[in-house]
Amino acid sequence: MANVVVVGSQWGDEGKGKIVDWLSEQADVVVRFQGGHNAGHTLVVDGVTYKLSLLPSGVVRPGKLSVIGNGVVLDPQALVDELARLESQGVHVGPDRLRIAENTPLILPLHRELDALRENASEGTRIGTTKRGIGPAYEDKVGRRAIRLVDLVDPKALPAKVERLLTHHNLIRRGLGVEEVNPQALVDELLALAPKVLPYMDRVWELLDKARKDGKKILFEGAQGALLDIDHGTYPYVTSSNTVASSAAGGSGVGPGALDYVLGITKAYTTRVGEGPFPTELTDEVGKTLGTKGREFGVVTGRPRRCGWFDAVLVRQTVRTCGIHGIALTKLDVLDGFDEIKVCVGYKLDGKEIDYFPSEMGAQARVEPIYETIEGWTDSTAGARSWADLPAEAVKYVRWLEELIGCPVAVLSTSPERNDTILVHNPFQA
């Protein structure tokens, strides 16, 4: 019986929501281990659509324990709002169904304001953040001045911690010509939220250790994608946390030995939201067709996603940096009807062929994709639930991708519906 880590193998938006929902039916515990409420996912359960951005996917399923780990940055107001939205849809999430690590750093209004101020002032050099305060909150965590969930327990000690935080932030705000934050007002705001969020607080490391010893199946759910990792992604056009699979351990308080199987969610083509390099991006009619057929708009931001052909170089690199055992290939049906399909199998950099994606920003912008072409298919793959249902050319495409990235397909998704899935290998039976 294995514990499973799910990560996106590209720039996010690979279809993790459906796969995690499908896996969460088998899991006993579902854990979010990094990120914040900047990465949304959509679930369809019993015909009802749920849009989540902070809570783990298992939260909409009765009998599942959902956990937010210490690697997440938590906006307490966003948590309260998301819980209220679920309540309005008939899903009550009490402390018996959700636990949050006591050492989770909080996103405060000043983080959101700073995020927006920086992004709006960075004309021409924007990173493409969602302006939800994720980056500034992680900065405070690393700077050892963050307000953490457990800090809300003691009202007498909280003001001194807020003063220490504001020594840093008000200095920045003065430099930006923005009104300073009143310490008492921030303390009052936090203490007003405390009764709404503290009932969910727990020692998550201890809770997960007990779950492991009790033989529970644990699903670790990553947000975004590995190419947005702060170290291994397309820096500086990345998120502010480690999104690779190994961060599931540090971001939830378990040892690396608790991670048995890594499933990489991989789109059958490539998309990206926001700024940054994208070697296979298509700005022609083909790119528009991929975007239209794939309904490529961000769940959180509503921004249209940039679209391009599958990049085997990037995914092969992610397979290595994440230690991926198998991939879940999604949105194969979007490629239905193309006469031919291209795949990037290498790059040219300054006239030289390379088989990796460089770390330096200038080199990332200069790489040119080397394509190979495969015959497309006219028959539909939508709704296929077995290999026999797929056109021969589609099967050939899938096998070709396996060969190029050096990793087998464990799951194949052929539509947004959770049952339209071909299971090759169950990750929980690793």
From Swiss-Prot:
Highest taxon of the lineage: Bacteria
Free-text comment on the cofactor: Binds 1 Mg(2+) ion per subunit.
Any GO BP annotation: 'de novo' AMP biosynthetic process
Catalytic activity: IMP + L-aspartate + GTP = N(6)-(1,2-dicarboxyethyl)-AMP + GDP + phosphate + 2 H(+)
Active site: 13 (proton acceptor), 41 (proton donor)
Chain positions recorded as Mg(2+) binding sites: 13, 40
Gene3D superfamilies on file: Adenylosuccinate Synthetase, subunit A, domain 1 (3.40.440.10), Adenylosuccinate Synthetase, subunit A, domain 2 (1.10.300.10), Adenylosuccinate Synthetase, subunit A, domain 3 (3.90.170.10)
Pathway annotation: Purine metabolism; AMP biosynthesis via de novo pathway; AMP from IMP: step 1/2
Localization (cell): Cytoplasm
Binding site for substrate: 299-305
GO terms of molecular function: adenylosuccinate synthase activity; GTP binding; magnesium ion binding
Family designation: Belongs to the adenylosuccinate synthetase family.
Purpose: Plays an important role in the de novo pathway of purine nucleotide biosynthesis. Catalyzes the first committed step in the biosynthesis of AMP from IMP.
Protein name: Adenylosuccinate synthetase
Organism per entry: Azorhizobium caulinodans (strain ATCC 43989 / DSM 5975 / JCM 20966 / LMG 6465 / NBRC 14845 / NCIMB 13405 / ORS 571)
Lineage: Bacteria, Pseudomonadati, Pseudomonadota, Alphaproteobacteria, Hyphomicrobiales
Chain's gene name: purA
